From Swiss-Prot:
Taxonomic classification: Bacteria, Pseudomonadati, Pseudomonadota, Gammaproteobacteria, Enterobacterales
UniProt xrefs under PROSITE patterns: APAG
Domain of life: Bacteria
One Pfam family from the record: DUF525
Protein name (Swiss-Prot/TrEMBL): Protein ApaG
GO terms of biological process kind: error-free translesion synthesis
Disulfide-linked positions: none
Residues covered by the ApaG domain: 1-125
SUPFAM superfamilies tied to this protein: ApaG-like
Organism: Yersinia enterocolitica serotype O:8 / biotype 1B (strain NCTC 13174 / 8081)
């Protein structure tokens, strides 16, 4: 039996007020992703897919190779962390998606990126 790779994804987001211009409907957010390899063999991140939704329901899809110009190899028990950003036209939105990955045998699999919120702090009580 082939063991399914065990990968955990966690995301933290923040509002970047210094780069935002609310009067021009420009709300900038940074998010930090931590990808942990909980399995017993290497995994490599090959690509990404994001679905970004603003509070008006407008959706944008983003996909491409790797993340921040890398296709990291993550060893068992290790993690890879990176920070990136998103610009919305509204002060509230969500992101979700998946990573395209390969295991140590070259078998492709997807790791889900759970939905997370992008919001200016004054909107969340």
């Amino acid at each position: 039996m082939i063991e399914q790779p065990r990968v955990c994804v966690q995301v933290q987001s923040i509002y970047v007020e210094t780069q935002s211009i609310p009067d021009e409907e420009r709300f900038v957010f940074a998010y930090t992703v931590t990808i942990r390899n909980l399995g017993r063999s290497n995994v490599q991140l090959m690509g990404r897919y994001w679905l970004i939704t603003n509070s008006n329901g407008r959706q944008t899809e983003v996909q491409g190779e790797g993340v921040i110009g890398e296709q990291p190899l993550i060893l068992p028990g290790n993690e890879f962390q990176y920070t990136s950003g998103a610009v919305l036209e509204t002060p509230l939105g969500t992101m979700e998606g998946h990573y395209e990955m390969v295991d140590h045998l070259g078998q492709a699999f997807r790791t889900v990126i759970p939905v997370f919120r992008l919001a200016i702090p004054t909107l969340i009580h």
